C-alpha cells in the first residue's frame, strides 16, 4: 500500500500538502506516511469528504434504489420460509441466496461480496443486530427480519418485525407503538429539516406512548458506500446531537427500535426500517 502511494505521489518531489481521512488512518499508518513525506503538510479532509458523500449522484441513487428492490425480494423469500421448526440460519440463507441471484441478474458484470441476512427469533431479537443462530422457530415467537444486499460497495437494507402464528397482547401493543413512531418519522423526513429536530419529536411521541425508556439507538442514518465493516457518514445520523439539515439527493433511513428486556411482557426487539431519497419538495420511500 505504501509503495503504491509513493509511486502515485512521487518521493523525489513530494507535494506541499497531503490530505488524510484521519478517522480512517491508524496511528501506525500515519507515522509511516509521515516518514515517507516528511516535508509535506498534512491536513484532515475527513469531514469535507464525508459531506461530499452525503449528497448522492443520480447514478448512486439508481444503485441504491435497485438495492432496496432487491432487499424486498430477500424479505419476500424469508417470509416464504418462516414456519415452525425452521431455523434462523436456514431462513437467513434462503433470503441471502435470493438477493445474490437477483444482484447477478441486475448487474451481470459486477463483483459480488458481503450481501447478508440477519434473522432472529424470540429473545434473540433483543439487540439491534444480534448474530443469527440455529434456534428453531416456535409458535408465538417475535421475529426480526433484516436483509442487506451489497452492490459494488453500496449498502441497502430492509428491516421488519413479524410474529409466528400469534402475537400476544403486550407484544402487539409494543409493535403498534413502534409502527406509529415509524410512520410519523417517515412524514417528518423532507428537505430543510434538521436531523435533531426529527429525533426530538419522535422522542416525545415515544414518551406519550410509554415506550421511550425502551428505545435503544438512533432513528436512522445515511446510505451509500458503507456497511457494518467500514462505517458510514456520521454527519447524517438521525440523532439528537446531529444538526445536519436534510438536502436534496441525501438518502436516509427511518428505523425506530425499542427493546423490552427478557422476563417482561412483550420481551424482544421491535424495529421497522425504510429508506428515503430526499427530493426538492419531499422524500421518496424506496
Predicted regions and their residues:
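Active-site neighborhoods and metal-handling regions in enzymes and metal-associated proteins
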Residues: 1-286
